[in-house]
A protein has these predicted regions:
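C-terminal nucleotide
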Residues: 2-48, 58, 62, 72, ...
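Gly/Ser-rich oxyanion-binding loop with an adjacent helix/lid
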Residues: 8-16, 23, 108-208
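Glycine-rich, flexible beta-strand/loop modules in the N-terminal catalytic cores of phosphate-handling
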Residues: 56-110
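Short, conserved micro-motifs enriched in small and acidic residues
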Residues: 57, 89, 93, 128-136, ...
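Short glycine-rich or small-residue beta-strand-to-loop segments that form or flank ligand, phosphate
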Residues: 82, 117-127, 320-328
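Helix-rich "cap/lid" substructures immediately adjacent to catalytic or cofactor-binding pockets
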Residues: 90-123, 142, 294-298
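Alpha-helix termini
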Residues: 103-109, 146-154, 304-312, 342-347
Length: 381
């Protein structure tokens, strides 16, 4: 039987009395957390990174961040951030500001010296300050430090709920990287545990968990013009209520498609959802597009390949020229050959990332049972 919890933000406040008798003065924790790709897109926020609409994503396997935090109780708090072993001033400032916002959630932060080492398994493109996997791994480390200092081990469900809540405060999409498989963030009818405060894992959903994901790197350097970004943010705010209804409808349709195991309906819905934002941009009076000519070439070739081969291979795309190709694992060899022979000439230096849907974050060098709190989809979907 699935337990039902109603959680509000005060559930994640720190119990200060526990920390004043710390169980240790120093320690180290390491988490590996993967990035996610959206099938139903997150279109904006209100208040403290609460989403205008529910979104649904797939957590990857090979595109991950591994973060280690060495912590020491000190008279004065401080943060040092290293990426690939190199001290990073910009990230140190960014994470220091983020940490300051979390004092009500982790009372111990005001007396800790934190040395953070982060390493990405995937390229960090210009224009991306911090990835969802970086924020997710950082949030998981902080929750583990809380357990070590208080000597109180939280129930698995609460631990990951809080980690997702904390990750959301750093980057909205990071709330979904705390779980594996398919993840929902935002309130959705018929899903009692769904929340704007954190993500929840949906499953088991073999239909989605079997998918391979290939990311075609069309450009590693393009950053949208500020006027275009300002226009998009304004438009997203203006259509927020409409977008909530539309995204909700798309997620419910997607869940029905999964139940029916209709791969081609899945392709149609995912591609339609992916292009909604770009249609709005193309119809705007502000000059600018996210697409490159190579982006359109890949879209055309994927659709042509699907039609000719009968293989349910589709794409999704974010606010960037790069494209994610999704396909069932049983067609892996055929699709990989198609990518190498047909799509790679459209990629920058023929770069692409080969990935698949993953199990979610793991703690490194410690015995830890990953969260098995899955939301079981009922027959009424």
């Amino acid at each position: 039987m699935v337990k039902i919890y109603t959680m509000i933000s005060t559930n994640f406040l720190s119990n200060k009395s526990k920390f004043f008798q710390p169980q240790k003065n120093r320690g180290s924790v390491t988490w590996r957390c993967s990035s996610n790709i959206e099938l139903i897109k997150y279109w904006g926020k209100y208040e403290e990174l609460l989403p205008f609409n529910p979104s649904l994503s797939l957590t990857l396997t090979n595109a991950y961040t591994e973060t280690k935090i060495d912590y020491t109780i000190s008279d004065k708090s401080s943060v040092e951030y290293f990426i690939d072993g190199i001290y990073n001033t910009e990230m140190t400032q960014l994470i220091t500001e983020f940490i300051k916002k979390l004092n009500s959630n982790f009372s111990f932060l005001s007396v800790l010296k934190l040395v953070i080492h982060s390493q990405n398994s995937f390229p960090q493109f210009p224009g991306t300050i911090i990835s969802s996997s970086e924020v997710g791994s950082l949030a998981l480390c902080l929750c583990s430090i809380e357990e070590e200092l208080t000597g109180q081990k939280a129930e698995s469900e609460f631990f990951f709920r809080k980690a997702s809540f904390i990750a959301r405060l750093g980057s909205g999409c990071a709330a979904r990287s705390i779980y594996g498989g398919s993840v929902l963030w935002g309130t959705l009818p018929k899903i009692n545990k769904s929340s704007e405060l954190y993500g929840i894992q949906l499953g088991p959903l073999p239909f989605l968990e079997d998918l391979n994901v290939a990311t075609m790197i069309v450009s590693s350097s393009t950053k949208p013009d500020p006027p275009l970004i300002r226009y998009i943010k304004l438009q997203l705010y203006n259509v927020a209520s409409c977008r909530y209804e539309h995204a909700t409808m798309h997620i419910l349709r997607l869940l029905d498609i999964i139940k029916r195991k209709d791969y081609f309906a899945f392709c149609g819905l995912v591609e339609s959802e992916a292009l909604l934002l770009h249609r709005m941009v193309l119809s705007s009076s502000v000059y600018g597009v996210f697409f490159h000519p190579e982006t359109l070439n890949i879209i055309s070739k994927v659709r042509s390949f699907r039609k000719k081969s009968g293989i349910p291979c589709c794409f999704t795309i974010d606010a960037a020229p790069n494209i994610h190709i999704l396909y069932p694992n049983q067609f892996r060899e055929i699709v990989i050959n198609f990518i190498r022979d047909t799509l790679l000439p459209n990629c920058e230096s023929q770069q692409w990332l080969d990935d698949k849907v993953g199990i979610g974050p793991v703690i490194i060098d410690k015995n830890f049972n990953y969260c098995d709190d899955q939301i079981i989809l009922q027959d009424n979907f």
